[in-house]
Amino acid sequence: MRNDVHLGHKARKRFGQNFLNDPYIIDGIVSSINPLPGQNLVEIGPGLGAITEPVGKLVDKFTVIELDRDLAERLRNHPDLAEKLTIYEGDAMKFDFEQLVKPNNKLRIFGNLPYNISTPLMFHLFEFHKDVQDMHFMLQKEVVNRLAAGPGTKAYGRLTVMAQYYCKVTPVLEVPPTAFVPPPKVDSAVVRLQPYEVLPYPAKDLKWLDRVCREGFNQRRKTVRNCYKSLIDKEVLEELGVNPGMRPENLTLEQFVDMANWLHDSHNADK
């Protein structure tokens, strides 16, 4: 039997398709999402319905976004789900999630994300953080490790800082390749991202936060003083409580934001 065909559908590499088919894992994911009737639920990439079907048994209606035309058509004709689903056929990377927001009913987003686009897709979703209650995603385990990492670890990087800027990050469940058809070449994991009601360390301008993160993690083995010498003087770093001799990979989220806010203020003062 071919290992890239599941329920009569051939997995498409260009869409990064791997279909979940382990009942124990599926049950664990649905339990962690804990979908309830009346909630504003949105699934990205429902695929063949491994998560969609059990969620559909618990709620009256929800929204799905599916890029694969054949899979979207299957859902439109699904005997149990068709009446419950609002189906958007298209690319979640270009989707305006604001259109799904309802008064006093924030979005609860979940999905088995295609690993080839998971990082840029999360950056896209962070733009809507004020409208999102939580997100549960199946991702490459390495990406979940990066999301949850702490300063000074190998996994700590720009994705870590930006994810933790917006969200509380909680790893939920590890998933082996055997839980999928076809099995991916990597281990997977489920993560919960809960956007903060109030950002703990708000940046005055995200462009500066992105800049200090990029500069720092592109030169993570340099000292902070050398890494940022064209942007911030050693004396200013010390005033901000940043040790100029440390490496950027040891900076905390708060320190990255402090540097970004100082750059914002100093550049605006020059105008």
UniProtKB/Swiss-Prot annotation:
Keywords: Cytoplasm, Methyltransferase, RNA-binding, rRNA processing, S-adenosyl-L-methionine, Transferase. Its main location: cytoplasm. Pfam families: RrnaAD (PF00398). Its EC number is 2.1.1.182. One of its GO terms (molecular function) is 16S rRNA (adenine(1518)-N(6)/adenine(1519)-N(6))-dimethyltransferase activity. GO terms for cellular component: cytosol. The gene is rsmA. This is Ribosomal RNA small subunit methyltransferase A. It comes from Vibrio atlanticus (strain LGP32) (Vibrio splendidus (strain Mel32)).
